[in-house]
């Protein structure tokens, strides 16, 4: 640049990113010369920049704000396959950590230190171990990668135009230490069904701007044959002051059966309730959802007691979840197709 050598490399290893920082003066035209040979794929040269006043503008914005909305997370440039990045926590598109990039952690810490209320909006395509944010942010909204009208949806949710009712479709672990090695195909400790620890957020977790109360759990039958379906019914009441949806979740446990999951989602139903309203809700549980895969890999229905939990999330966790428990008896046995 301007006849000054900025950097060079004779390596064909495109998995490594090389950076060089320069200060550019306003009003000066710079000549740029790039010479390269591309023997493989994924090579890239690009110029990125930030304005010197951005840090000052950021401090002024924090000072003037009543509430801070921090939009943080990941991006397509970080999440993917065989990507030429070498950033801490990432390796060629794979992740070596579930934490946020450290620069974003530092940003969030500085925002909270301002003393202003901080709301975190997450943009990501996979789980994040946002342990510090969980303890220090006033609220956290998981937006994923929401698309063209995502900003409108996020703004309306934060403004209280509607009550969020999404539920996590995967487990948010606290760290990679809670995740079994990828070269171990044993199901022990893997996914919400076999995990014995306490994650950051459980599969099926989600909060609302109101609260719900469950009562009077019943089943359409108390003894279930090997070919029978099952249905669970209960009353759900909105005991808060805002109309909202509740996602009623049904989890099953097969106590004493080797290889059976500790818990398994068997059915769910989303219902809308006005403040003070009570609805009788029925959740259908198809016959196949009463089965489990045993240690030999066979999917079967086994005779014995089947424990059932119905509520707004999983039956265990540090966050108390409203719900009910019951049991039915399975009287027959069957081996089902895989």
Which residues are covered by each model-predicted region?
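C-terminal non-catalytic regions of proteins with extracellular/luminal or membrane-system context
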Residues: 1-338
């Amino acid at each position: 640049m301007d006849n000054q050598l900025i950097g060079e490399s004779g390596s064909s290893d495109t998995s490594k990113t090389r950076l060089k920082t320069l200060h550019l003066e306003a009003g000066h035209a710079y000549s740029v010369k790039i010479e390269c040979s591309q023997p493989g794929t994924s090579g890239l040269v690009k110029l990125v920049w930030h304005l010197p006043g951005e840090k000052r503008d950021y401090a002024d914005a924090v000072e003037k704000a009543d509430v801070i909305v921090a939009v943080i997370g990941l991006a397509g440039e970080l999440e993917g396959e065989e990507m030429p990045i070498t950033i801490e926590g990432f390796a060629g598109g794979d992740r070596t950590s579930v934490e946020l990039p450290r620069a974003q952690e530092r940003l969030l810490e500085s925002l909270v230190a301002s003393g202003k209320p901080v709301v975190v909006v997450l943009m990501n395509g996979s789980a994040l171990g946002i342990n510090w944010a969980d303890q220090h942010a006033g609220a956290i909204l998981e937006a994923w990668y929401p698309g063209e009208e995502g900003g409108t949806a996020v703004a309306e949710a934060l403004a209280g135009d509607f009550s969020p009712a999404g539920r996590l479709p995967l487990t948010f672990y606290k760290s990679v230490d809670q995740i079994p090695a990828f070269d171990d195909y044993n199901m022990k400790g893997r996914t919400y069904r076999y995990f014995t620890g306490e994650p950051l957020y459980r599969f099926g977790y989600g909060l609302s701007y109101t609260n719900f109360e469950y009562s009077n759990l019943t089943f359409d039958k108390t003894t279930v044959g090997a070919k029978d379906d099952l249905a669970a019914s209960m009353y759900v009441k909105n005991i808060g002051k805002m109309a909202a949806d509740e996602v009623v979740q049904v989890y099953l446990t097969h106590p004493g059966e080797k290889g059976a999951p500790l818990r398994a989602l068997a059915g769910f139903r989303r219902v809308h309730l006005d403040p003070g309203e009570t609805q009788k809700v029925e959740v259908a549980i198809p016959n196949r959802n009463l089965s489990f895969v045993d240690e030999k890999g066979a999917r079967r229905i086994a005779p014995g007691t089947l424990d059932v939990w119905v509520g707004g999330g999983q039956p265990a966790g540090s966050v108390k979840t409203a719900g009910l428990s019951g049991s039915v008896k399975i009287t027959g046995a069957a081996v089902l197709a895989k």
